[in-house]
From Swiss-Prot:
Keywords: Methyltransferase, S-adenosyl-L-methionine, Transferase, tRNA processing. This is tRNA/tmRNA (uracil-C(5))-methyltransferase. One of its GO terms (biological process) is tRNA processing. S-adenosyl-L-methionine binds at Q193, Y221, N226, E242, D302. It comes from Sulfurimonas denitrificans (strain ATCC 33889 / DSM 1251) (Thiomicrospira denitrificans (strain ATCC 33889 / DSM 1251)). Transmembrane segments: none annotated. GO terms for cellular component: cytosol. One of its GO terms (molecular function) is rRNA binding.
């Protein structure tokens, strides 16, 4: 990736030597990090070299009343750097960025605009969120509708306590995994995987690691069903939990979008779910689910950066197989200290979700000793 802001913009930290060098550094670092638990080959899944980010956030910097610019934090933490392009972002976002600023300025809706967020799909759909330090009135809505038509985008106007939606607040992403197509509605301001090509590879790896057996699957931290829905063809039934109400609603919508019928999504934290599973407490949210009908031998987890707590690790250890996707190698390392008391790590993978940074996503498969 060629970027004229390398070394100045804080979005990319590791840029000397190009893509292969930064990836090699990540691989070697994580081989050493996980050596106490796994000495086998770590499968490595590369990112596209540029235009890989399907969502991005930029500050807006005003130069008097004449001009507005995109801005990012400087790598040296000395304020911001003004930018006119970012080769990280998807081709659709890249092409839109200058057109959007010109339209905002031409239609005079830049007053107290402080940020712009982009969300795109592989097909080129884009939701643009315009963030303001002022109330948004009917005039804003009228102008935003004009810009939406001009640029063929969806627009969200956001201010404190306000969300003005022009047309719709989501894009429909199509993922291709091992020759199968999956559709997902990605909603603005909710978590989605930022690197679509690496996401497809993560799902594919996890599918191949899931054991083939006539049984059911339990998933914790299921989000909007990014993994759950592709997994559905491999199991009789899937029970998937997530604490976020909006994510559960999105997961149910995505299940319908893909015509999948063998998943039960439940809005519950892990602690509550364990109490329900063990019959300690009865929850109305579980009243339509016959827990005793599930034969679960495999658990899939994709926790937040904080990883799993000790109680969740103990719970996961009940099951014969554990597939763990981690967005923080340090917390995965901590959790493996507990999980390997009962399980062996038999396979690992590294996914380069965020090129030119120190960040890596990891996958681990564990089986009971």
């Amino acid at each position: 990736m060629n970027c004229k802001y390398f070394g100045i913009c804080g979005a990319c930290i590791v840029y000397d030597g190009g893509y292969e060098t930064q990836l090699s550094q990540k691989v070697e670092l994580n081989k050493e990090l996980f050596a106490p638990f796994y000495m086998g080959k770590i499968s490595v899944f590369e990112s596209p070299r540029s235009n890989y980010r399907s969502r991005s956030e930029f500050k807006i910097w005003h130069e008097g009343d004449e001009k507005i610019n995109y801005a990012m934090n400087r790598a040296d933490k000395g304020g911001v750097i003004l930018i006119d392009e970012c080769p990280q972002v998807s081709s659709a976002i890249f092409a839109l960025m200058p057109k959007l600023l010109r339209a905002i300025k031409r239609h005079k809706i830049d007053f107290k605009l402080f940020g712009v967020d982009f969300l795109s799909s592989n097909s080129g759909e884009i939701v643009v969120s315009l963030l303001y330090h002022r109330a948004l009135d009917s005039t804003f809505k009228e102008i935003a509708e004009i810009i939406s038509d001009e640029l063929d985008i969806y627009i969200i106007g956001r201010s404190r306590g306000q969300k003005v939606v022009i047309k719709q607040d989501y894009v429909t992403e199509i993922l291709h995994v091992d020759g199968v197509e999956f559709k997902f509605n990605y909603i603005e301001n909710s978590f989605t995987q930022p690197n679509a090509k690496v996401n497809e590879q993560m799902i594919g790896w996890a599918l191949r690691e899931l054991p083939n057996m006539d049984a059911d699957l339990l998933e914790l931290y299921c989000g909007a069903g990014n993994f759950t829905i592709p997994f559905a063809s491999k199991y009789r039934k899937i029970l998937a939990t997530e604490i976020s109400k909006s994510s559960i609603n999105a997961a149910k919508s995505n299940m319908s979008l893909n015509k999948v019928k063998n998943i039960s999504f439940v809005r519950m934290g892990v602690e509550e779910f364990v109490e329900a599973l063990d019959g300690v407490r009865i929850f109305n949210r579980m009243k339509e689910i016959d827990i005793d009908s599930y034969e679960i031998k495999t658990i899939f987890v994709d926790p937040p950066r904080s990883g799993m707590d000790e109680a969740t690790c103990r719970f996961a250890s009940r099951y014969e197989n554990i597939i763990y996707i981690s967005c923080n190698p340090q917390t995965l390392l901590r959790d493996l200290e507990l999980l390997t008391k009962t399980h062996n790590v038999i396979d690992m993978a590294l996914f380069d979700q965020f090129p030119y940074t120190h960040h890596a996503e990891m996958g681990a498969k564990l089986v009971k000793k």
